[in-house]
Regions:
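Beta-propeller domain segments
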Residues: 26-38, 149, 166-203, 212-214, ...
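Surface loop/turn motifs at the tips and blade-to-blade linkers of beta-strand repeat domains
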Residues: 45-49, 92-97, 137-144, 206-211, ...
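Acidic, glycine-anchored loop motifs typical of Ca2+
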Residues: 84-90, 124-127
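Blade-level signature of beta-propeller repeat domains, shared across WD40, Kelch, NHL, RCC1
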Residues: 389-415
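Conserved beta-propeller blade signature
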Residues: 62-66, 108-111, 159-163, 226-230, ...
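Asp-box/WD-like beta-propeller blade repeats and closely related beta-sheet repeat scaffolds
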Residues: 99, 115-155
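Residue-level detector of Asp-centered blade-edge/turn motifs that repeat once per structural unit
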Residues: 57-60, 104-106, 154-157, 219-224, ...
Length: 415
């Protein structure tokens, strides 16, 4: 009896061991090496996607990533965690065009190439119903080889906003009379369309705001019921006007600027730029400036200014409840570059808001995407934050367009 019992026990143990060996091991989320405030943590949910630009997360938690270079012939990747274990276990790729803009609402996924805005219908589970036949919302957008991205925003009234950057840094070559820039009718602004009307032409749009050299990061603020936009500043002061400026000046100015935009707003490019140290709008040298002369006061005053060359590529107003109260309704900003003035950058910043207005200065929220010491670099940056999105649980997602890494940042008060 005893021998039979031992034999049966051994067989059961052997079978159990074999089953354990044949069952796939649970895949643990990869911890991201970012510097965060206490209580926050970050994981890598995807990597090696390539030029991952803007991102959007559906109410079901699916992460949509827009690529600026095709990967396996596709420009949109949908990443799903179907068993909710914190790791991506399903990937669907579609769209044969590159671009930057992407957003998702209850019924549709919107995505842009540099010339066209597309729309995909979603089913009740917020899955794209037909990946091969998107609807065309806007076509014929101005696109050049430089700064051709078309980021997107939709407001509560179903207006679609498309940012169209200037392909000229200061409109110097295009301005023949030394007084007026002829590009402002077609670029350097934000155009408004109907988010539900098909086959609109660029000319059907309304120029909502102008004088914005290049906007990548912008977002609708539901509290103030207004559009906020971040401008990429110009450059090349000392190279074109060495009689007035040196290399240090070019590294320090102009500020990257945040604006609250109402219909008809004019931020002043190319005629002015902003000095964030003296808090003044200065006349651009192409139009008679010398680094001291002030620009016309009629141009919009920035809501907030940041050091030069940080490259604000995305903006998100946080409406979740996962993060502490301090972050509620505040703005997260993805900085895609670095400030020579501060030796900081390649980070996600935060600006506190209350009643739809900034209530304090900006601070770095998530750092060390670069993976190097920016004061004493030993090589190039490893990652560059480019897109931001909020998940249904309140988690913050960040895309990197250098390696194609997607980060998920969460908060747990217990650490």
């Amino acid at each position: 009896m005893f021998k039979k019992f031992v034999k049966k026990t051994s067989v059961l143990a052997f079978v159990s061991a074999c089953l354990a060996c044949s069952s796939p091991a649970k895949k643990e989320p990869k911890i991201a090496k970012l510097t965060l405030e206490p209580g926050f943590s970050a994981t890598v949910i995807a990597d090696s996607l390539g030029a991952a630009r803007h991102i959007a997360v559906s109410q079901q938690g699916d992460v949509y990533v827009k690529l600026n270079n095709l990967k396996d012939g596709k420009g949109i990747y949908c990443l799903s965690d179907t068993d909710r274990d914190g790791t991506i276990d399903k990937t669907v790729a579609f769209g044969d065009y590159t671009g930057t803009g992407i957003l998702v609402d209850q019924k549709y996924l919107y995505a842009s190439s540099n010339t066209t805005v597309y729309r995909y219908k979603l089913d009740q589970n917020q899955q794209v119903t037909d990946v091969d036949h998107p609807e065309v919302i806007v076509k014929g957008l101005v696109a050049h080889a430089i700064d051709g991205a078309k980021p997107l925003v939709i407001d509560k009234e179903r207006n679609l906003y498309v940012a169209v950057a200037s392909y000229s840094d200061a409109c110097a070559d295009e301005t023949k009379d030394g007084k007026s820039c002829p590009l402002l009718d077609s670029v350097a602004g934000i155009w408004r369309f109907d988010a539900d009307k098909l086959n609109q032409e660029y000319s059907d749009g309304e120029q909502y705001a102008t004088g914005l050299k290049g906007v990548m990061g912008f977002a609708w603020n539901d509290v103030s019921n207004s559009l906020y936009a971040l401008q990429h500043g110009r450059g090349n002061f000392h190279e074109k006007f060495p009689q007035y400026f040196d290399a240090t000046y070019s590294a320090t100015y102009p500020a990257e600027t945040l604006y609250e935009l109402k219909k008809g707003a004019d931020a002043g490019w190319p005629y002015i730029y902003y000095d964030h140290i003296r808090h003044k709008k200065l006349l651009a040298p192409e139009f008679g400036g010398d680094g001291k002369k002030e620009g016309d006061s009629k141009y919009l005053e920035p809501t907030l200014a940041f050091p030069a060359h940080l490259g604000p590529n995305a903006m998100l107003f946080y409406t979740g409840t996962m993060f502490p109260e301090k972050y509620r309704n505040g703005a997260f900003i993805a900085f895609h570059n670095q400030s020579p003035e501060l030796h900081k950058g390649f980070c996600v910043a935060f600006v506190p808001f209350k009643n739809g207005k900034p209530t304090g200065n900006w601070e770095i929220f998530a750092d060390d995407f670069a993976g190097i010491d920016l004061k004493n670099p030993t090589g190039p940056s490893q990652h560059k934050p480019c897109g931001l999105a909020q998940g249904p649980d309140g988690a913050l997602y960040v895309s990197d367009d250098l390696q194609g890494t997607i980060y998920k940042i969460t908060y747990n008060a217990k650490g």
